[in-house]
Amino acid sequence: MTIKITRSDPRYAMLQRSRNLRWDGNPAEAAAEIELCETAEQAAEALQRAVNAGVRPTVRSGGHCYEDFVVNNPGGTILDLSLLKSDALPGDGKRYRISAGHELGEAYISLYKRYGVTIPGGSCFEVGAGGHITGGGFGVLSRLHGLTIDWLSAAEILTVDNKGHVALRIVDEKHEPDLFRACRGGGGGNFGIVTGFLFDRLPAAPYEVANA
């Protein structure tokens, strides 16, 4: 069950705000509610409720959106994935997984301590993986290793069909390759809600890093 935050909840004002204060939230255009999702299944249920109710869902991972795509959603629902941080590995466990709710700093630390690898992502540790990776995932290691999406092997994504049914699926180069390609930086992640990113291999973490 999701954690549902309505306008009457004292947490609403804080959770409705974006980290980008340029889009601080106009009360007249604010979302009716926020649903905090801790699993992909909860996100699917929340999305299905929004579809059934005929309201516009917007999605937030870390809240660093450069544009006003999420916060001001009159009468709609914000699906907040910031608590969706499962490290569970599918199948034989040979893939690395980053959930949409992970902040980049959390992903870097977990990958380094467990496996000695990294992703060539951004340098702001509080940016959410959900938005960063679906946007391409550029960072300080990208001149050496490319974009984060260059390493992406599969994506766990929620989609809605033409009958309004929500489905959770895993897409890759063999299973729905067009949708997988769209998840790799195309369209700003607007083809569905990506809840998890799967990597067959990742580059080794740098031996040392200099801060200037």
Q: Where are these predicted regions, by residue range?
A:
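Long, contiguous hydrophobic alpha-helical segments, chiefly transmembrane helices and signal peptides
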Residues: 66, 129-134, 138-140, 155, ...
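N-terminal accessory segments
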Residues: 1-147, 166, 170-171, 209-211
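Internal, well-ordered domain-core segments that constitute the primary functional module
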Residues: 95, 142-169, 173, 179-182, ...
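C-terminal cap/substrate-recognition region of VAO/PCMH-type FAD-linked oxidoreductases
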Residues: 169-212
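Short, structured patches in soluble enzyme cores that scaffold and shape functional sites
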Residues: 81-83, 100, 123, 151, ...
